[in-house]
Amino acid sequence: MFKYIGDIVKGTGTQLRSMVMVFGHGFRKRDTLQYPEEQVYLPPRYRGRIVLTRDPDGEERCVACNLCAVACPVGCISLQKAETEDGRWYPDFFRINFSRCIFCGLCEEACPTTAIQLTPDFEMAEFKRQDLVYEKEDLLISGPGKNPDYNFYRVAGMAIGGKPKGSAQNEAEPINVKSLLP
């Protein structure tokens, strides 16, 4: 008999607690957003759409080193290297299959030139999977992205045809090793 009364009291308490919780939520700020009208807050380091950036000079930053494709755990990046007359490398084609991409950011970390950057854009829905394969023309943006002053060829000091050694940023003049001998 006491067990029966205890079960009734316990059940009534559970229902009252649930009703108080529902009533309390009626006066709180809503968690649901009306999406297109109200934008979702994204943290600063949110990893969304991948873009290819340009140098401050307007040239492509990508040097087709293939490190992004090697670092990608799902293999959604493919590219092929080509070379200009002055010896500068660039990707002949650069392709990302966003239907396979998991937006892990490893390609951005592996890129030595900061050409690949992840933006906070996440609206990439398509009706056909073929439309989720982005080519270089779709990925290139007009600006330098997160690092506006960085230029790989000036910082790295790589030899470019017609440019003397030691003329790059942070690069010293070549040392004549034979002059150091006694």
Curated annotation (Swiss-Prot):
Q: Which GO terms describe its cellular component?
A: plasma membrane
State the needed cofactors, names only.
[4Fe-4S] cluster
GO BP, sorted A to Z = aerobic respiration
Q: Which family does it belong to?
A: Belongs to the complex I 23 kDa subunit family.
Which taxonomic lineage is given here? Bacteria, Pseudomonadati, Pseudomonadota, Gammaproteobacteria, Pseudomonadales
By what name is this protein known? NADH-quinone oxidoreductase subunit I
The record describes how the cofactor is bound as: Binds 2 [4Fe-4S] clusters per subunit.
Kindly give the Gene3D superfamilies that the UniProt entry links to this protein. 3.30.70.3270
Q: How does it assemble?
A: NDH-1 is composed of 13 different subunits. Subunits NuoA, H, J, K, L, M, N constitute the membrane sector of the complex.
> Which gene produces this protein?
nuoI
How does this protein sit in the membrane? Peripheral membrane protein
Keywords in alphabetical order: 4Fe-4S, Cell inner membrane, Cell membrane, Iron, Iron-sulfur, Membrane, Metal-binding, NAD, Quinone, Repeat, Translocase, Ubiquinone
EC code = 7.1.1.-
